[in-house]
Amino acid sequence: MAANEKTYLSETAKVDQSSVQPFPNSSKIYVEGSRSDIRVPMREISLADTPTDFGGEQNRPVRVYDTSGPYTDPEVQIDLRTGLPDVRSRWINERGDTEALAEKSSLFATQRLNDPALASLRFQHLRTPRRAKSGANVSQMHYARQGIITPEMEYIAIRENMSLQQAREQGVLQEQHAGQAFGAAIPDEITPEFVRSEVARGRAIIPANINHPELEPMIIGRNFLVKINGNIGNSALGSSIEEEVAKLTWGTRWGADTIMDLSTGKNIHETREWIIRNASVPIGTVPIYQALEKVDGIAEDLTWDIFRDTLIEQAEQGVDYFTIHAGVLLRYVPLTAKRVTGIVSRGGSIMAKWCLAHHQENFLYTHFEDICEIMKAYDVSFSLGDGLRPGSIADANDEAQFGELETLGELTKIAWQHDVQTMIEGPGHVPMQMIKENMDKQLRECGEAPFYTLGPLTTDIAPGYDHITSGIGAAMIGWYGCAMLCYVTPKEHLGLPNKDDVKEGIITYKIAAHAADLAKGHPGAQIRDNALSKARFEFRWEDQFNLGLDPDTARAYHDETLPKESAKVAHFCSMCGPKFCSMKITQEVRDYAAEHGTEITPRAPGEAEEVVRMVDVEAEMQKKSDEFRAQGSEIYSKV
């Protein structure tokens, strides 16, 4: 815990200023739905006009999906001590199926609240927790199966459909290659009804706890944009609440669609409260981590009662999805004995140790329906954990991994009987040629429930670069149908990530997710690529920077070679210089063609441009004949 944490939390909590700066040449816009309180945020990037040398035309702004929440809206006053503005309380209250609780249901949460020693750490503006009324189910899946389109579903449809609407407006920029979606059912237009139907059949989830009203609704499913998750959390080795909140705001700025708080150090409860109250994206946790802390790290001392209290504690704080390692069965544990790296999942190893110590079946498995009752009372989504995932490519796709996956498929069907939203976690370390088998088996065993994978890492030889080894696998499995990709930072296997590592991991995974969207043929996915390519050809440097995923780094790299402001309007690039710039030469060819009576006809993407003569060929040939005679009719001449 940082030495100044008492002062920070109780008196002077301030948002990290680097997280609230608007992106260059961008503005926050809101698209309104069928009711005034459905206001969907997007980031609009303004572009310069095409220079007259290139035809001189106006370039429309480009809108991009925005996960940064109110932090990048200059009209919103951010105060971490009071949390983010409420988005969903009115929708939740209108449904009339929840009730405010007079006190917390968790014994542990009550003890923390009544401990005066924690006053300086505690978030001061605690929300009154809500729970489903007796006999009610408040999950988005339950509403969807009743045929109800919730405001959350309409909000998501507007958000996901953004690129398609732009495509209709953008003319030439709407050109897009056909995709290969491997059986996914991506529609031409995403409507609220389509969102409802996907949630109803279990192919998508909307992680949105009723106790997280600050949330801006989003969706995870193979027929929607590929999402990414960023991990934060303290450990026994260090970090403070201040640092974790800063990682949250920093991560969502750069594109994290969800955040998992994996804290295992001190004050887990208080850290999580600060994170949720200041999060506009869904927050996930692994409850077994905190339950283990409650028994001083002794796995065999874990009990169902302790775990149940932990679930309720976190659900009433507003956690949107839980990783539950219910598929680590006693009979699977011996299958890992001959592995190169054994069991590498922290949650998986905890439950394996408990099973062996008691020689009983995993209590998360035997109490699974009890867990479902808790989940549907708060609308917490399952993220069924892959506790037996491979920790090396040598162990990929083995009997232990696939046995657990089959069990997760069985548990998914039970969760769906309770109308509880469910996604499935996946590997891990898998070489490229074995990735598709993972995706195909998951779709088959789990009824197309969303898949959520950690990478996978495609090779084990690059410590310090595992954001790259895993980004390769992430792009591939995203293309094959994975719905959400859990980022990996350069510090994977080496240490706790700092802010810079978080950003690098997120940008790497935004690239992977976007590449997958392009490959699947998601409607409108190519607009941003086309806009940036057009800016590059027209030497609109500022537009190139601003259309990129990381404008700051792009600008900094350009400045290293061409630091002067005049270079930002130069008609050559920093790589080749003025004489060898291929794009400059191409423009000169076009200018020459126009000047000499030829026309270059653009073809479809991937085809060569066609040069059509617009003059009398015989006259031109006669002109060359006259030149030859005038020079003495010599075949060879000295140069």
UniProtKB/Swiss-Prot annotation:
Cellular component, GO annotation: cytosol
Cofactor requirements of the protein: [4Fe-4S] cluster
Gene3D superfamilies with a match to the protein in the record: 6.10.250.620, Radical SAM ThiC family, central domain
GO molecular function: 4 iron, 4 sulfur cluster binding; carbon-carbon lyase activity; zinc ion binding
Binding site for Zn(2+): 429, 493
InterPro entries (UniProt xref): ThiC, ThiC-associated_dom, ThiC/Bza_core_dom, ThiC/BzaA/B
Pathway: Cofactor biosynthesis; thiamine diphosphate biosynthesis
EC number: 4.1.99.17
Enzyme class at the top of the EC tree: lyase
Residues that bind substrate: 231, 260, 289, 325, 345-347, 386-389, 425, 452
Keywords: 4Fe-4S, Iron, Iron-sulfur, Lyase, Metal-binding, S-adenosyl-L-methionine, Thiamine biosynthesis, Zinc
Cofactor binding description: Binds 1 [4Fe-4S] cluster per subunit. The cluster is coordinated with 3 cysteines and an exchangeable S-adenosyl-L-methionine.
GO BP term (any one): thiamine biosynthetic process
Catalytic activity: 5-amino-1-(5-phospho-beta-D-ribosyl)imidazole + S-adenosyl-L-methionine = 4-amino-2-methyl-5-(phosphooxymethyl)pyrimidine + CO + 5'-deoxyadenosine + formate + L-methionine + 3 H(+)
Coiled-coil annotated residue ranges, if any: none
Binding site for [4Fe-4S] cluster: 573, 576, 581
NCBIfam families, sorted: PRK09284.1, PRK13352.1, thiC
General function of this protein: Catalyzes the synthesis of the hydroxymethylpyrimidine phosphate (HMP-P) moiety of thiamine from aminoimidazole ribotide (AIR) in a radical S-adenosyl-L-methionine (SAM)-dependent reaction.
Family of the protein in this entry: Belongs to the ThiC family.
Quaternary structure and partners: Homodimer.
Name of the protein described by the UniProt record: Phosphomethylpyrimidine synthase
Protein source organism: Teredinibacter turnerae (strain ATCC 39867 / T7901)
Lineage: Bacteria, Pseudomonadati, Pseudomonadota, Gammaproteobacteria, Cellvibrionales
Gene that this polypeptide is encoded by: thiC
